[in-house]
Amino acid sequence: MVTPWARGAGRGARGKYMALISPLAPSLSPRAFHTHRTMPKSTAQSRSRMKAFLIIGLCLPVVAVLFLWLFIMPDVSVLRATNPAVTALMETRQAQAEAQGHTIGRHWMWVPLSRISPYLRQAVVAAEDASFFTHEGFDWEGIKDAALYNLEAGELKRGGSTITQQLAKNLYLSSERSLLRKAREFLITRSLEQHLTKERILELYLNVAEWGQGVYGAEAAAHHHFKKSSRDLTDDEAAWLAAILPSPRRYDPLRKTTALARRHDRILKRIDREPTQPEP
C-alpha cells in the first residue's frame, strides 16, 4: 500500500527530475532528433563541395583551351625579314574549293614595296584605311561605327578593320565571325604593330591580299586584270584594283558595275588630292 506521503514524494522527485532535464527537452524531442539524424549538416556541405568540384572540373578544360587559343600568339617578329610561304586565307580558299569537289590554282608573285606602283599604295590606303600611317593598329572611330551598325543589325556584319587587322586575319585566322576570333585578331594586330614598321605591314598586306579567284598580291593582280607589272599601274587602274578589295571574287575591274564605278571614282579623287607617297 502506497501512502499519501510516498505518492507526494514520488511526484516531488519526478518534478525535480523533469526540471533538471527540461533545458535539454527541445534538442531531445523526437522530431528534432529525427531531423538531425536524417539531414546532417556535414552531408549537405559535402554535396555542395562535390557540385563545386564538378563544375570546376568541367570548366577548367574549356578555360585552358581558350587561354591557349587566345594568348599563344604566332611569332610575328620573323616577318621582319621573312615572307610567309602561305596564309590562312589561302588555305581556307583551298579547303572550300576541295569541299565543293574541285581545285583552284594559286597565282601569287611576291614583290618588294618599292616595285609596287605608288598609285596602288595610295589607292589601297585611301580605300581601306585612311589613317593607316597615324594609328597604332586600330581605327577606334571606325570600330565604333561598325559596332553601332552590328547592334542595329543584330549580328556581326561589319568589322571596321584596319589594314593591320586585315593582315592579321589573312595570315593567321579563319573566316568565321565571332567575339573570340575578334579577341585573337586584336592581340595579333597589336603584335604586328609592335614588331613591324608601317612600310613592312603595307608591303605584306599588298602581297597577300586576295584580288580574285586564286589571285593573291599586287603583282599577280596587275598581271591578271591588266596584263602588266604592278609597278606600271596607272592611277585609274590602281583605283579599280583598290575598289574590288572588299569583294575580290565578286567584282572584276573589267566588268564595271554601278556600285564598283562609284567606289572607283571616290578612290581616284582621293589619290588626286593627296601627294604621291615617297619611294620606300
Please provide the spans of the model-predicted regions:
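Residue-identity detector for glycine
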Residues: 8-15
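Juxtamembrane regions of bacterial inner-membrane/periplasmic proteins
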Residues: 39-280
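N-terminal Lys/Arg-rich, disordered targeting/topogenic segments
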Residues: 17-50
